[in-house]
């Protein structure tokens, strides 16, 4: 499960973000947003973990990490051109849409 989730995190392009729930759904685990978060905690540091954020609503996401990790996530996203307003990110502008899984 974790490897499949990480595979989808790798598909998020520079300058885009996806929510934990979107990653889980794309990987075939529609109720796996917590597992998606956990898979990032134990992942290779080269995985673009900073591109995965929490969901506020359909139009807005947010950085859930606190302290230095949250600051690092915001800095990495901003370096890729993502505008971070406090902890919030515009999903309409910066959200990645995964291709639908084959059935």
Go through each PLM region and give its residues.
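Nucleic acid-binding interface residues in structured DNA/RNA-binding domains
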Residues: 1-103
């Amino acid at each position: 499960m974790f490897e499949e989730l990480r595979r989808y995190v790798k598909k998020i392009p520079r300058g885009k973000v996806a929510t934990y729930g979107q990653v889980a759904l794309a990987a075939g685990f529609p109720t796996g947003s917590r597992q998606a978060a956990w898979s990032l905690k134990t992942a290779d540091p080269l995985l673009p973990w900073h591109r995965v954020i929490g969901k506020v609503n359909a139009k807005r996401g947010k950085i859930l990490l606190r302290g230095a990790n949250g600051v690092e996530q915001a800095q990495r996203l901003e370096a890729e051109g993502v505008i971070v307003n406090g902890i919030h990110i515009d999903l309409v502008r910066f959200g990645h849409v995964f291709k639908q899984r084959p059935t």
